[in-house]
């Protein structure tokens, strides 16, 4: 913001904004965009440690434009997930895995920017946990998660089942929940949040860019029909 240095704004965020957010119960997690030119390593660590003291879960956005060391900090602090991670080295990804940190990919960003794709299949071979999301923002106005999954399947040679796991069961482990019920799976005793497809093939949800095969959604056990 204007009239602030990165140091003064970090101090204001920690001393004024963060306590207000926690007091108002507006958040369960704190997320820092750790990137050269934005919040650096030191500022990111300071903010995240303050958030942890307030009882918030920790998340990060890292290495969208270069390998800026955010992955190392994510591993050090055992954050729940480090998103973007576009230029994070495989060595650092493995450190993140050892620290229980999920790698959250946002494929819409390289799609919109014309950048290269991360090596998803090497991640699978090394059993590094990863998720996907849309990263909807003014520079990447993609709201459709099925479209994001179709990018992985059709442009990055990712198996449809891996894409499905990335935005269901894997994603559920990165999100704080109010109860201990299972999320992200279709199983007895799990929360009944699921989509019903108008298709004979389950893979259709991520193989038809520009068209949604979802006909109905079950949200907390209640059936909601879509207008197609």
Annotate each PLM feature:
Residues 1-68:
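Metal-coordinating catalytic core of metallo-dependent amide/deamination hydrolases
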Residues 29-31, 131, 218:
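Conserved beta-strand segments that form the floor/walls of ligand-binding pockets within enzyme
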Residues 57, 67-182, 197-199, 209, ...:
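Active-site-adjacent C-terminal substructures of enzyme catalytic domains
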Residues 169, 188-228:
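C-terminal cap of metal-dependent C-N hydrolases
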């Amino acid at each position: 913001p204007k009239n602030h240095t990165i140091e003064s704004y970090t101090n204001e965020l920690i001393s004024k904004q963060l306590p207000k957010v926690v007091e108002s119960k507006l958040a369960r997690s704190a997320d820092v965009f750790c990137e050269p030119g934005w919040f650096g390593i030191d500022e990111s660590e300071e903010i995240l440690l303050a958030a942890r003291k307030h009882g918030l879960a920790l998340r990060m956005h890292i290495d969208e434009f270069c390998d800026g060391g955010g992955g190392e900090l994510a591993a050090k602090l055992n954050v729940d997930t480090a998103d973007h991670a576009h230029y994070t080295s495989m060595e650092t990804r493995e450190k993140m895995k050892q620290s229980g940190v999920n790698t959250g990919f946002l494929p819409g960003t390289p799609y919109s920017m014309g950048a290269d794709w991360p090596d998803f299949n090497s991640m699978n071979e090394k059993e590094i946990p990863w998720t996907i999301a849309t990263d909807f923002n003014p520079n990447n106005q993609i709201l459709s998660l099925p479209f994001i999954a179709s990018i992985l399947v059709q442009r990055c040679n990712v198996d449809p089942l891996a894409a499905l796991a990335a935005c269901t069961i894997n994603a559920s482990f990165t999100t704080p929940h109010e109860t201990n019920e299972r999320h992200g799976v279709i199983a007895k005793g799990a929360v009944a949040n699921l989509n019903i497809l108008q298709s004979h093939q389950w893979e259709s949800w991520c193989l038809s860019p520009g068209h949604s095969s979802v006909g109905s959604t079950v949200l907390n056990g209640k059936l909601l029909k879509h207008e197609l």
